[in-house]
Swiss-Prot record:
HAMAP family: RutD. Belongs to the AB hydrolase superfamily. Hydrolase RutD family. It catalyses: carbamate + 2 H(+) = NH4(+) + CO2. Residues 14-115 form the AB hydrolase-1 domain. SUPFAM superfamilies: alpha/beta-Hydrolases. It is an enzyme of class 3 (hydrolase). Keywords: Hydrolase. This is Putative carbamate hydrolase RutD. One of its GO terms (biological process) is nitrogen utilization. GO terms for molecular function: hydrolase activity, acting on carbon-nitrogen (but not peptide) bonds, in linear amides. It holds the Pfam family Abhydrolase_1. PANTHER family: AB HYDROLASE-1 DOMAIN-CONTAINING PROTEIN, HYDROLASE, ALPHA/BETA FOLD FAMILY PROTEIN. Involved in pyrimidine catabolism. May facilitate the hydrolysis of carbamate, a reaction that can also occur spontaneously.
Amino acid sequence: MYFEILGKDTPLAPTLVLSAGLGGAGSFWQPQINALGEHFRVVVYDHFGTARSKGSVPDGYSMADMADEVAQLLRSLNVDCCYFVGHALGGMIGLQLALTHPQLVEKLVVVNGWPTLDSQTRRCFKVRQDLLLNSGVEAYVRAQPLFLFPADWLSQHSALLDEELQHQTAHFQGTENLLRRLTALMNTDFRPHLADITTPTLALCSRDDLLVPYHCSHQLAASLPNGELAEMAYGGHAMSVTDTEHFNRILLGWLLKTQNAQTRLQP
C-alpha cells in the first residue's frame, strides 16, 4: 500500500495512523497534518485498491482483510503500537484492528462511525450504489458531496467542488473495487464484539451528519468498555474538512490528554 510518513521525526515521537473513509485516499486528512505533525509521527496511507495503492480488491474482501493490511504496514515500519484515527470506514478498520491486533493500538478515534449499519446509512449507500451502476462514475462522484457536506458549505465552495469533480472522476478507484469495499463495510457488525475492544476509544460525531446519524456514535461510545463521546454541532459527515479548527482541537485534546473520568467532550 502507498503511504507517507509526516510530522515529527524524533526517535521517541509516538506514531499516529490516519485512515480515510470509503474514498480511501490519505489526502483526505490534509487539513489535519500540520496540527497533528507537531506532536506525532503521522502515517497516512491509501487503502488497498484506491488512489495510489493500486490493485484489484478480491471477491469476499472483508473488514478483517483491511485491518490485516494496516497491521502488516505497521510491522513493516517496526511500529509496535500506535494511535489510530479513522473516518467512517477508516474508523471501522480501527475497531477491527483493536479487536484482532489489540497490542498495536494504544488509543483509537472513530469519526462518524457505528456499531452496526444504521437504516439511514444503508439508504444512502443504496442510492449511491444505484447511481454508480445505473448512471456511471461521473454521476456518482457529482452526488458524493451531498452526503458529505452541509448545504451552506456546498453553496460557498461551488468552484472547489467543480475542480474536485474532475479530479475524482479521473482518479476513481473503479466500480468493482468500490462495490466490494462497500459490501465489506455494509456487512460489518461489531455489536457482538464491542465488549472485547478495551482500547481507549473516542467516538467523534457531527450532529448534522446526513450519512451517519449522530446517535450511532452515542451507541458506539456507550457500548465500548473504555468508550468516550465527543460531538460537533456543525460540519456534516466530513466535518474534519468543513470545520477543521474545531475538529482538530477536539481530536488533539483527546489524543494528548491523560486518561481520566471525562466521558463527554464539547468543541
